[in-house]
């Protein structure tokens, strides 16, 4: 019987709008500094809205899960030295801020 040696595929965030290939990410799509995005997640994507609406009342949903995973990987790589991973934490906070402001702006799309 052959043994499968392929690396397991991550199923934590199946959102196709999340770009996980670092070479393909364009963090500065324009010269306007307000449009810069320093995290791979898209917390306002239609899939994020659907998954939030479909979850149970006691379930937790994090549209910035990819940023959270990147923060944890950085901590593991750097022996849990928070100072070396500050940019990852800031990116996660920015993603959460974008998500919460989108929910506050139009809560009807998130229920």
Curated annotation (Swiss-Prot):
Family annotation (SUPFAM superfamilies): Cysteine alpha-hairpin motif
GO BP field: mitochondrial cytochrome c oxidase assembly; mitochondrial respiratory chain complex assembly
Keyword Transit peptide: yes
Chain residue ranges for the region called Disordered: 1-21
Compositionally biased tracts (Polar residues): 7-20
Sequence motif Cx9C motif 1, residues: 64-74
Cellular compartment(s): Mitochondrion intermembrane space
Domain CHCH: start-end pairs: 61-103
GO cellular component, one term: mitochondrion
Keywords (A to Z) from UniProt: Disulfide bond, Mitochondrion, Transit peptide
Motif Cx9C motif 2 boundaries: 85-95
Keyword Disulfide bond: yes
Coiled coil regions in record: none
Pfam families associated with the record: CHCH
Disulphide bridges: 64-95, 74-85
PANTHER family: COILED-COIL-HELIX-COILED-COIL-HELIX DOMAIN-CONTAINING PROTEIN 7
Family: Belongs to the COX23 family.
Function in brief: Required for the assembly of cytochrome c oxidase.
Annotated protein name in UniProt: Cytochrome c oxidase-assembly factor COX23, mitochondrial
